[in-house]
């Protein structure tokens, strides 16, 4: 093996290692977790989705919802991007016309139903009649 090929191989490995390390550092720096505390004080079961306002993302996603029985309090942990704005939409199961926050499919405007992903947990969000 010539001295030149060893030098190029060594440089290539260093570049590859640098790119891998930069990828790990970049991905981890923007990640955060927040827990939404949701309480159903309505006499009927509720369905809840959480919507990013900064990217096209819904929790839990894939056509699923978080389900809260009447009287139930649920902790909903999310992995999100640091600083991301997340709003909740909740509605009576089987009655999308009775809703809280942004409602089904993030379709309504709301006041005080959005939180910034900075870690920790929200105060208890009480969904009342």
Language-model regions, residue ranges each:
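Bacterial N-terminal signal peptides that target proteins for export
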Residues: 2-16
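A short, solvent-exposed beta-strand micro-motif common in secreted/extracellular proteins
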Residues: 82-94
């Amino acid at each position: 093996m010539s001295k030149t090929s060893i030098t190029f191989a060594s440089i290539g490995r260093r570049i590859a290692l640098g790119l891998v390390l930069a990828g790990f550092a970049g991905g981890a720096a923007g990640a955060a977790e927040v827990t939404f505390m949701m309480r159903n004080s309505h006499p009927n079961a509720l369905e809840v989705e959480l919507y990013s306002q900064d990217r096209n993302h819904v929790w839990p996603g894939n056509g699923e919802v978080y389900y809260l029985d009447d009287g139930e309090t649920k902790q909903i942990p999310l992995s999100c991007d640091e600083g991301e704005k997340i709003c909740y939409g909740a509605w009576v199961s089987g009655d999308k016309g009775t809703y809280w926050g942004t409602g089904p499919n993030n379709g309504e405007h709301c006041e005080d139903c959005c939180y910034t992903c900075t870690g920790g947990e929200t105060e208890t969000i009480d969904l009342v009649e």
